[in-house]
Amino acid sequence: MSKVYDVIIIGAGPAGLSAGLYAARSKMSTLILEKEKNGGQIVTTDEVANYPGSVPEATGPSLIARMVEQCNEFGAEIKKDPIVELSLEGDIKTLTGNSGEVYQARVIIIATGASPRKMGCPGEKEFTGKGVSYCATCDGDFFTELEVFAIGGGDTAVEEAMFLTKFARKVNIVHRRDEFRAAKSIVEKAEKNEKINFMMNKTVHEIKGDGIVESIVLKDTVTGELEEIHAHEDDGTFGVFAFVGYLPQTGLFKDVITLDQTGYIPTDDNMNTNIPGVYAAGDVRVKSLRQVVTATADGAIAAIQAEKYIDNKFH
């Protein structure tokens, strides 16, 4: 019979590692399962300037490495094994990994995160973290007094473009249609901002550069014409921020747990899902702000609630 853990955490990003740290520190037997590499989105961040207490030289990978160390110090196990099947009903939850191994636990914490929807153009992957970003709050400061391009036409794209005007010299909003999906009030506010330039009926065809972004090729969605825009000679680079949506990593939980219409997991303030003993933490859940600091808070709350659940249910 396989070992029954107190807590199994699915996902080793900031939320999952925070949950693992708090769970293991509370003397619960804890296993963290990750399908790819530890860290989630933050491992693509070269500098972490908005996480309280992080040292100046902190990077996404270094912050995650320290979180992993802390989990290990308190006895949490971390294993790479993508989950392919799961049963969350009943007192003991069962997960099956891609390896064929079966895992059992009294509590499951879902911390699978959400990933930015990609633009799908050549150069996007190559220059992610080198001029291409998906987070204005995380990376806007790096483009102080530079030109940036904000891609998208929804509320988030226009709001983030306005946020970028706090740093950038000029913000070009690139949208594939001639009208925004964003609320009219948000668009009107952006139109009054002198730093914002609108580039309608355009998509990103290609991003070019040598080590860093140096030019962007836009395609006119009406005429098909291509236009290459180079960074100003004095700047050498510019930013490309993609705000074309996020994809919650919840495919595994469809028809198993309650999801909202966009695929995120609704929880209460204590991270409870609709299934007793199953919690969700971090970017995967319905929330207003998706940042490392909010993900780690979610993970801590989920772990503490898990401890209370186990004490009440099994002791």
Where do the protein language model's features map onto the residues?
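FAD-site-proximal beta/loop scaffold in flavoenzymes
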Residues: 120, 126-142, 242-291, 298-301, ...
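Beta1-alpha1 glycine-rich phosphate/pyrophosphate-binding loop at the start
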Residues: 5-74, 152, 158-183
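A Rossmann-like FAD-binding core segment of flavoenzymes
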Residues: 71-97, 102-105, 166-269, 308-315
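Short amphipathic alpha-helical segments
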Residues: 20-21, 44, 120-123, 161-163, ...
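Hydrophobic/aromatic beta-strand patches that form the interior of the parallel beta-sheet core
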Residues: 31-33, 79, 109, 133, ...
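FAD-binding core/adjacent interface of flavoenzyme oxidoreductases
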Residues: 1-10, 26, 77-146, 224, ...
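Glycine/Thr-rich phosphate-binding loops of Rossmann-like dinucleotide-binding domains
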Residues: 105, 118-119, 158-159, 181, ...
